[in-house]
């Protein structure tokens, strides 16, 4: 006795909206946050999928650049300094996150041109 009545079909295995969209970020959780956040009275079915995809893309982009920064510094672990270097050296990410302060991120190395030693004719020879 399965409780499905006469000739009822077995229910298909549940598949998350994240896996249907081919995403790692949780679509269901994003949908819940959109509903609970009082952003709008109603939330469409596609909105959380799109938002989760955008957030996943941005996270992947930042982690890729931060991983490169860590490798350049001969480190195997990404730390806040690597995130800072990755974001500030990328023009578009820097513009997007211009108002963001990363704790323990430090600053970009920069020396004003007027402070550098002057090149003389003797030094050139």
From Swiss-Prot:
Keyword field contains DNA-binding: yes
Modification type Phosphoserine: residues: 2
Subcellular location, record wording: Nucleus; Chromosome
Location of the region described as Disordered in the Swiss-Prot/TrEMBL record: 1-21
Biased composition, class Basic residues, residue ranges: 1-18
Function of the protein: Core component of nucleosome. Nucleosomes wrap and compact DNA into chromatin, limiting DNA accessibility to the cellular machineries which require DNA as a template. Histones thereby play a central role in transcription regulation, DNA repair, DNA replication and chromosomal stability. DNA accessibility is regulated via a complex set of post-translational modifications of histones, also called histone code, and nucleosome remodeling.
Family: Belongs to the histone H2A family.
Protein name per UniProt: Histone H2A
């Amino acid at each position: 006795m399965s409780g499905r009545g006469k000739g009822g079909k077995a229910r298909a295995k549940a598949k998350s909206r994240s896996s249907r969209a081919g995403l790692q970020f949780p679509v269901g959780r994003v949908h819940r946050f959109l509903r609970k956040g009082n952003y709008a009275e109603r939330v469409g079915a596609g909105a959380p999928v799109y938002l989760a995809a955008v957030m996943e893309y941005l996270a992947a982009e930042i982690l890729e650049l931060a991983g490169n920064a860590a490798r350049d510094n001969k480190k195997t672990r990404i730390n806040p300094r690597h995130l800072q270097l990755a974001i500030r050296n990328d023009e578009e990410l820097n513009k997007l996150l211009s108002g963001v302060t990363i704790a323990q991120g430090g600053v970009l190395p920069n020396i004003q041109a007027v402070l550098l030693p002057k090149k003389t004719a003797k030094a050139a020879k």
